[in-house]
Design a protein with these regions (language model features):
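Acidic/histidine-rich catalytic cores of soluble enzymes
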Residues: 43, 133-200
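N-terminal pre-domain/capping segments
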Residues: 1-115, 133-136, 169, 198-199
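Active-site groove signature of glycoside hydrolases
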Residues: 105-128, 143-146, 170
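Secondary-structure boundary/capping motif
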Residues: 23, 54, 127, 152-153
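Short beta->alpha linker loops
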Residues: 60, 122-126, 155
């Protein structure tokens, strides 16, 4: 067997299997097995989607998780978080509650052996700043996902970059999504939007 001419490692976000998981044609274990079979050794888990009883993470799930990692030759790399700011019908979460939610998700990542937490794009910069010291303490990186229609000169991303540069926190960064490189929507997406009543 020849040695590859690069050191790029392949991983997969289990978000890629969301339809199969939702339709129950694949279990979490199946998703990990398939990832391993195609040579994607790094695994990103979406806890809200794939951990039964989330935000509670049972000892049984953790044991199964590490058993699957060993069995299929995969490694936990990242978890994803969604900041549920509208948890209550009459108000948004306060800054303190949002940071506490991040702490919970950081703890879940640590428990599952992941060193990266991918934060959803709508995460306010002040929440990332507030959670950074805890992430540093736990040895976790908080990376803001960047995908279309956002780009690296978008005002929202610039606000995040200001926090990253000002604090100098090694826990904060950006995670590019391939959608960053989208120049236009695929024709089928535009046509469907028009059929559904969108105005050009």
């Amino acid at each position: 067997m020849t040695t590859p001419s690069h050191a790029i490692k392949r991983g997969v976000s289990l978000y890629s299997f969301q339809e199969e998981y939702f339709l129950r044609t694949l279990s979490v274990e199946d998703c990990i097995r398939i990832a391993g079979e195609i040579g994607a050794r790094g695994i990103e888990l979406i806890p809200e989607q794939m951990i039964p009883g989330f935000p509670h993470v049972s000892d049984e799930f953790v044991a199964d998780w590490f058993s699957w990692m060993e069995q299929y030759g995969t490694t936990p790399v990242a978890t994803d978080l969604f900041l549920d700011t509208k948890r209550y019908p009459d108000r948004w979460l306060t800054l303190e509650e949002q940071v506490a939610s991040f702490h919970r998700d950081i703890d879940i990542a640590v428990r599952l052996g992941a060193t990266v937490v991918r934060a959803i794009i709508n995460t306010p910069p002040e929440v990332m700043e507030g959670a950074a010291p805890y992430a540093e303490e736990k040895g976790v990186r908080l990376l803001l996902e960047v995908h279309a229609p956002f780009h690296y000169e978008h005002p929202w991303i610039l606000q995040h970059l200001e926090v990253m540069h000002r604090t100098g926190s090694p826990a904060l960064g950006l995670m590019p999504d391939m959608g960053t490189f989208v120049e236009r929507f695929p024709r089928v997406v535009s046509e469907r939007a028009l059929r559904n009543g969108a105005k050009p």
